[in-house]
Amino acid sequence: LRPGLVQLEIGVQSTNPQTIEAIHRKMDFGRVTEIVNRIAKGRNIHQHLDLIAGLPHEDLRTFGESFNTGYALGAQMLQLGFLKLLHGAAMREEPEEFPCVFSEDPPYEVQKTPWLLPEELDVLRAAEDALERCYNSGRFLETAAYAMAAAGLSPFVFYCRLGAAGARHGTANIPLDDYTAFLYNWCAALPGIDKACLRDAMVRDRLATNSTGRLPQCLHVTDALLGRAVKRLAQNPATAPLPGVRRGVALLYGTRQVVFVDYTQKNPV
């Protein structure tokens, strides 16, 4: 199967058994995990997992558990959506059992449930923005993984805190380089973070996802060693640049290595 030809959307919605029962679904999550992992080994199919906030019996704690479980599957995208109470939906038609508040106009998005307060839904919306920028975009995968591991944060806590900081900072429409600087400064302030290792992760992320080969100012370091490294790479037949192919080169100070990327093709998955 040609890589990128097929995208699978997997509607997990929740991993909370009480929620799954309330929405009249049956799900063997162990089986879902097995299938997702098997497909991932082929490296040719884009997998998109969906979670829905606002479902019955799903509070912030249990949604966090669903988020962490879904995130651990490592799909290319983890979509954090919000329940829409369309006409005919049980939570709309049975207000005694599901006393929810939702917007009067389409798409009738949930605003409050017996299990989630409006301010908690705001927390999740901010987390969604951070998740889109860092994970679903594919731009900061190594950065997020390093920061979570070093600071000892679960994915849910990490993205909730990052989203809240982004909302305070006003990152909604800022350019990528500015968001990179914001993310670096925010992660650098977390406990357990080594700034050199954090920069290493961000450099690898930026070089892997930006075919200009250019690093933003916040990651740029003036160092004569870089010029020498570029020269040595060019002189070695095994690492010499290909004619007409753009290359990005950087020094990694945490691991004391040189990293380079030749932009010959894009991962279609």
Predicted regions mapped to residue ranges:
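Conserved non-cysteine loop/helix-boundary elements of the Radical SAM core domain that shape
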Residues: 1-105, 111-114
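Short flexible/disordered coil segments
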Residues: 6-18, 45-51, 74-77, 108-121, ...
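Generic alpha-helical secondary structure signal
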Residues: 18, 30, 34, 61, ...
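Radical SAM enzyme core and accessory elements
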Residues: 129-269
